[in-house]
Amino acid sequence: MTNAPEKVLADAPELGHRWTNVASIVVALAAAGALAELLAGPGYRFGVLGLGAGIQAIRWAATVAGILLVVALVGTLMARHRGMRYAANLFVVAAAISLLTSVPPTILWFRGKNLPNIHDVTTDMENPPRYVAVLPLRKGSRNSTEYTGAVAAQQRQGYPDIAPVMLEVPAIQAFQRAAGVARSMGWDIVAAEPGELRIEATATTFLFGFKDDIVIRVQSNGDGSRVDMRSLSRVGGSDFGVNASRVRSFMQKLMANQAT
């Protein structure tokens, strides 16, 4: 008759094999979720996925990753407690992958909750710069170039710091400086009209390849000049602060250029 200690020893390899299999499955699921999240943006950018499908893929990947993170952490503790080091290491790998998959979308979601639900930001809410040259490029885009009072109200509350820049140089010099800064931003310059003191450009986001259109307007202001800017997304309801960040970055560089 086999006594209890001998039976435990006999079952140990089989039990360890089962734990390793479970840990391997968790790793595979975590890797699949990470891959789905990574491919969602390029999938939309190259026309394989629609916008809704791409966003939904990220949402589901992040949700599943959050669940797998908990499973992997519990699995790590249990496997280590039972002395199954290899299975524990696999669970650690799964936890790391799940953490990297779930954290960025979660941060973006929380950030979006505290930002205005707008996709159009300008330094002049009373008389925003108007698009001209980029209009043909916006055919079929979901978002209109019409600036509404509802957008202005949300911008005032969410981005009170967005304001025009005053330069102590004539308008044509301000235009030249603005054009130089615009080129340094890596945007595709669509038009630079010195006669109208207007610059238009398009910025493309890295992951999804979203197109955001920019217009910069320069006006005389006494002995100096005033520079206004507008940044508008072609698709999407909320831009998660991207357009406001772009306007701030441009204006800061323009002011730094003046200081030098």
Ranges and model annotations:
Residues 1-35:
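Membrane-anchoring hydrophobic segments
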Residues 200-205:
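Short beta-strand segments that buttress and anchor functional surface loops
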Residues 208-237:
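Beta-strand/loop substructures that line and gate deep hydrophobic ligand-binding cavities in soluble
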